[in-house]
């Protein structure tokens, strides 16, 4: 199968940006700046970037409990993303929930899964 260069470049950019966000989030946690917890997905970025590369307008997506930085790929602005993780009012739920409350229904993000194996894919 042959892919267009533009598609491959965007996929690489998405993988790189997600990795950088995961590393930043891990660094902030190591500095004790994250009041809650994180589930680092470092090393798993390509799997989520690849899945998200197939999204079409109107599709819905539920974030995994790892690679929460994939929220950025589906439209979560950085100030909102880091606001929630750092317990700031600019977060998705006003900084009250941390990574468990990342989500943006307006971008088709239903939220995240915090438990392994708790979700089933349901086509709509």
Question: Model-predicted segments: where are they?
Answer:
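Charged, compositionally biased N-terminal leader segments and the immediate start
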Residues: 1-11
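Conserved N-terminal diphosphate/IPP-binding helix and adjacent helical/loop segment
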Residues: 2, 18-19, 23-25
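Cofactor-binding active-site loop characterized by glycine-rich and histidine/acidic residues
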Residues: 23-26, 31-124
């Amino acid at each position: 199968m042959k892919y267009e260069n533009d598609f491959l470049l965007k996929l690489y950019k998405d993988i790189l940006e997600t990795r950088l966000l995961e590393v930043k989030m891990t660094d902030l946690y190591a500095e004790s700046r994250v009041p809650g917890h994180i589930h680092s997905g470092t090393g798993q970025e390509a799997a989520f970037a690849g899945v998200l590369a197939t999204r079409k307008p109107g599709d819905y997506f539920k974030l995994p409990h790892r690679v929460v930085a994939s929220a950025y790929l589906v439209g979560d602005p950085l100030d909102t993303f880091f606001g929630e993780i750092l317990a700031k009012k600019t977060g998705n739920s006003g900084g009250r929930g941390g990574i468990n409350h990342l989500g943006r229904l307006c971008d088709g993000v239903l939220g995240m899964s915090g438990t392994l194996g708790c979700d089933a894919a349901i086509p709509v």
